[in-house]
């Protein structure tokens, strides 16, 4: 099956691990040649990214934000097992060679930093983590450094597991527990806002428990989409995860209030086990968010306290001017009296929903990373060349006229609907031009939606024997690789949801249906998310669902 069955783990190791894993346990690795770093061959980075060809020295990513490692990461840290992986890199358990302290090292492959946007995201993540004061609720950054092949963020180790997993594992889940979690999340938001930072991607997966103790602190771990802001400043870039996205994000006019909305979505899920705004498609999710109708009728809401429901309503207030601030949320009676909140179990239905939500996310995350991993350098390079050809005056942007002219030149490669989408992008962004990052994002969206090739590749990754079905053992092995634990219980829960014809295995059609139901495309690709939701926003603007106003 060739490259389509290449594990994301293998790809990540090729990009990152080979440049810094110790040759043998506990031993230092000899200094590597400067030009022999990871990704030296192929994978050019467009628009100022961290890429470079064979024999080329890669440009520094961190600059003043980090230190440069001449010999590689293992001069200072011994890296061990993989803890997780994302779009750009892999997180490893590591040990400080001097102090023997166990830490986590997030290694970001420079080869995957394809554009200036990617590089700036990493640089800003480090700057924000350094800017925020130390807090028991935020993972601490010990060091940021880079070598030839990767950027390494060495952080405090959190071994207590994800938020929902801990809740599901407990035999007794109550409003009181939900209130304690909510307080921690909103305290993180308050700290960020006080120090001029919007998180922009609050979701359960971005919170881990520090350890496995019952009283372990909950910590925010990911600031990859966070941004600095000044009072009154508004942003238009669409980022974040669909379920947790505030309506003003879709309207392209937002400020720090979006973090309260996202925290409100998490609270709603904590209390009932499902998102408040859900649909079969991304457009359906977006329209549900814009309608803002909150369901308090289904189980277990009749048994939830009025104070809890009042706080949910106020956090999910569609008008950001009327939405509670972090300070007001923390002063709300439900949180002020958290110790008096009902300690009666919310019921098995909530735990069951949370477990399903968590495990389906894990399966989708795995599949989406396979999709992201197989966006080839050639695909990106083709887009880059098209951009250069259209940018006839070489000013780094494609104007409306250049786009129209370029589309005529490249017309055979673009369907009419795709041409229209690109033109709409220019018409609605207010600049009458596309920079490379915008052009790339929209183009990636067009490529991915043009056919099911990427979904087929992801399916074949799981279908190891090529018989046309993902069988229980194949699914179990893939999820074990992804750190889900060697548990058939997880597999059976996923099968129960995805295997609609109940034949004990997952067909391609069942897999596609799962992937297209409320899928969180942010986990597939940051570029894809930006392109997809910018395109979706344009569509909603065009059909009148979204009104662009100066708020």
From Swiss-Prot:
Where do the annotations place ATP binding? Answer: 83-91, 106
Per UniProt, residues of the EF-hand domain are: 378-413, 414-449, 450-485, 486-521
UniProt activity-regulation remark:
Activated by calcium. Autophosphorylation may play an important role in the regulation of the kinase activity.
Enzyme's top EC category: transferase
**Alphabetical GO biological process terms:** intracellular signal transduction
Q: Where is the lipid attached (N-myristoyl glycine)?
A: 2
The segments labelled Disordered in the record are 1-57
Composition bias (Gly residues) maps to 36-55
Q: Which of UniProt's keywords are assigned here?
A: ATP-binding, Calcium, Kinase, Lipoprotein, Membrane, Metal-binding, Myristate, Nucleotide-binding, Repeat, Serine/threonine-protein kinase, Transferase
Its placement in the membrane is given as: Lipid-anchor
Positions bound to Ca(2+) 3: 463, 465, 467, 469, 474
Pfam families, per the entry: EF-hand_7, Pkinase
Q: Which reaction does it catalyse?
A: L-seryl-[protein] + ATP = O-phospho-L-seryl-[protein] + ADP + H(+); L-threonyl-[protein] + ATP = O-phospho-L-threonyl-[protein] + ADP + H(+)
* Lineage top rank: taxon: Eukaryota
Which EC number(s) are documented for this chain? 2.7.11.1
The residues listed in the UniProt record as binding Ca(2+) 2, with positions renumbered to this chain, are 427, 429, 438
Give GO terms: molecular function aspect only.
ATP binding; calcium ion binding; calcium-dependent protein serine/threonine kinase activity; calcium/calmodulin-dependent protein kinase activity; calmodulin binding; protein serine kinase activity
Q: Where is this region: Autoinhibitory domain?
A: 341-371
Q: Which residues bind Ca(2+) 1?
A: 391, 393, 395, 402
Gene3D superfamilies per the UniProt record, alphabetical: EF-hand (1.10.238.10), Phosphorylase Kinase, domain 1 (3.30.200.20), Transferase(Phosphotransferase) domain 1 (1.10.510.10)
Which CDD domains does the UniProt record give?
Answer: EFh, STKc_CAMK
Its job: May play a role in signal transduction pathways that involve calcium as a second messenger.
Q: What protein family does this chain belong to? A: Belongs to the protein kinase superfamily. Ser/Thr protein kinase family. CDPK subfamily.
What protein does this entry describe?
Calcium-dependent protein kinase 3
